[in-house]
Amino acid sequence: MSSKKRSASSRRWLQEHFNDKYVIEAQKKKLRSRAWFKLDEIDNTDKIFKRGMFVLDLGAAPGGWSQYVVNKVGLKGKVIALDLLPMDSILGVEFLQGDFREKSILKRLLNCIGDKKIDVVISDMAPNMTGISSVDIPKSMHLAELAFDISRDILIPGGSFLVKVFQGEGFEQYLREMRSLFKKVKVRKPDASRIRSREVYIVATGLK
């Protein structure tokens, strides 16, 4: 992609972003990001979170999802958030910065979890997007697979997994794998997800 095309694309994205009703509403409500509204819509439909739950938030920064979940699980619940990027603290959320593919970070994460299993894993992880589908989609699928792999190891029986995926090559196979391990699997496209984006959210409940 030429620099001129990238520049035009960037300008269009910025214009859309600042005119976006969810961005405006997020600023009014002092929310970390517009992603809060995506999770709110999904949770209103699928009833994922309950008081007292133990939740792991992957790809958490800047904290929109953690901000939503910590209010849902309450004081008796627990939220662990993890991201490569730094994240400002949120009351009730334990944040780890790093890549869980690294042994040292994975060890810290498992120490935070302790003997208790996780009720829900949520992942809004996304790669640095290039705008080239043949590059972006395999990268996003790789992140979704990593989230899926760790979920299988740490979720309680009957636990839930919510993950962002970009539709394209590998998507149907990923869905089949999810359906083999969870009792119920749904694909959601919340209103706050931009129409042009290939992103969807897979809600998997009832780990077998």
Swiss-Prot record:
S-adenosyl-L-methionine binds at residues 63, 65, 83, 99, 124. GO terms for cellular component: cytoplasm. It is found in: Cytoplasm. The active site is at residue 164. Coiled coil: none annotated. CDD domains: AdoMet_MTases. It catalyses: uridine(2552) in 23S rRNA + S-adenosyl-L-methionine = 2'-O-methyluridine(2552) in 23S rRNA + S-adenosyl-L-homocysteine + H(+). Its EC number is 2.1.1.166. The keyword Membrane does not apply. Keywords: Cytoplasm, Methyltransferase, rRNA processing, S-adenosyl-L-methionine, Transferase. GO terms for molecular function: rRNA (uridine-2'-O-)-methyltransferase activity. Belongs to the class I-like SAM-binding methyltransferase superfamily. RNA methyltransferase RlmE family. Specifically methylates the uridine in position 2552 of 23S rRNA at the 2'-O position of the ribose in the fully assembled 50S ribosomal subunit. This is Ribosomal RNA large subunit methyltransferase E. It comes from Hamiltonella defensa subsp. Acyrthosiphon pisum (strain 5AT).
